[in-house]
Amino acid sequence: MIDKKLNSAVEECVSNAPETQEENAQQMAERLQKEVDEYKEMVSSISSQEKLDELEKEMMKEYDDYEAYLKDVRYPLPASTTFEGKEFSKSDVAGKIIYFISKIEQTWQYVLGLYELCKLWKSPTFTEINFGALDSTLRLLDQCKFQGMSEWRDILIVNEYMKPLHEQYAKDTTQHIAIAQKHDAIIKQRDLIEPVKSKTDK
């Protein structure tokens, strides 16, 4: 299941990236997938609970370090974008993003997050975006359905505006999922050897 998540996340980001960026993002995806496959194979050969505990400790350190990186990373926002020969400012695009996010129906416990995200996009001093806000924006837009030529055009403008961010976002997302895959491999191997250990202890 996680493998499919990695592949679909990469394919979505890469398919939206400019052609000059696609090869770099795709190469990284292939390298990380190979790395994860090799790691899974290595973990599957381990029968020691202590060794798995050591690996998990190392993996959690890698996870914490990467979470710290994602917390600090910033993606510069373009001042404008061009679609069908017409220029649209960051403010124009932000208005379209806010419009689409505002169409999403949510229960009250999620409203504050949506409200704060829209406030962020509305800010005139908003010139760079962190990973969490970008990830939330893209995931929320992915939930939307678009009706009519006007909305279709507007989401295409938003996508065009986001293109300069896609490669780095794809790399950051892919690395994040790869770390989760490795940790998942450790958990699955532990689940396999613990019943065996319990039987031998009886």
Question: Could you describe each region identified by the protein language model?
Answer:
Residues 2-202:
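Positively charged, low-complexity terminal tracts
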